[in-house]
Amino acid sequence: MDKLSGISSSSLPYKGMFSLLSIADKKHADSIYNPHVNGGFLLTNILQKCNISKVYGQEANLGKYKFDLMNLVINGADFKEIHIDQGNCITSPKFFNERFDVVLSEIPSSIIYDMNSKDRSFFTKLYDVEKFKRNLRRSEFPFIIHMLHQLKDDGVMAVLVRQNMLFRTFDEDIRECLINEKNYLDTVILLSGKLLRHSFDNFSILIFKKNRSSKDIFFIDASKDFDDKLTDENIEKIADAYASKKVIDKFSYLAGIDEIRENDYNLTVSRYIDTFEEDTVDLNEVLSKKVRLDKKLGGINEDIDYWLNELDLYD
């Protein structure tokens, strides 16, 4: 269990969808990187679905680091091709000069929020954060910047995020940079918070690519169709929509950059997909119910008249 994200490590359908989306465009990927290995469950799941030979990752927690290695080997990874290092990927990146075909992760809040002023200064200089037109604040974006740095130009990246980073006002500048200037964000997928053990707040998976030719962003709202469980059919529906970029009423939508700009780069899925269901009224059923109620009311009135006469209460 990831105590920070609340995601069950045994939630294989969720893990399966996450990994499936991250490799959808990289069926012949050679390398994969996870900056927050956290038990290795995402990595082992993706290795079962795709023949990726080189596995890279970091784990800040020393105890988990040893478990990560063991779990990967038990699940069939080649020990000689496993490159997992212990350390904080933000302040002590072990693979800074490497680039990977697939980069995927959940965001551990402790890595972000434990940064002191020295760490922030180091990170700002190392990653040239000023090009993103922002100062570091309490935000998930340093982690995302790190992941993008490690991604190949033709690679694909998937990251799980909380909803608030999609609309926070103080993060609008970096969203604008990643969307409009860099054109990295490809897809936003909203999922139900009931997939998480310790939260009912919805969350999203963001898909990034560096070699995009279009500035459109694809939105999928899977928060209502799939509640606290994802079946293989659910995953297939999401993956098919993602691969085809097909617009489906109340489920998926392709938004242009002008529309996103008009929304101040707010990425909340409900801004783009209307899932409101109007109540339908069966007039025949309503009329039938009215007849039944009128009949019942008539019987009650007859009873009242009877007792009023019996008790001689009429004027």
Positions of the model-derived regions?
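Short, surface-exposed basic-aromatic patches at helix termini and helix-loop junctions that form
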Residues: 25, 47-50, 73-77, 175-182
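Conserved short loop/turn motifs at secondary-structure junctions
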Residues: 4-8, 56-61, 86-92, 161-166, ...
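Class I S-adenosyl-L-methionine
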Residues: 1-58, 64
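A conserved structural/catalytic subdomain of Rossmann-like adenosyl-cofactor enzymes
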Residues: 97, 101-315
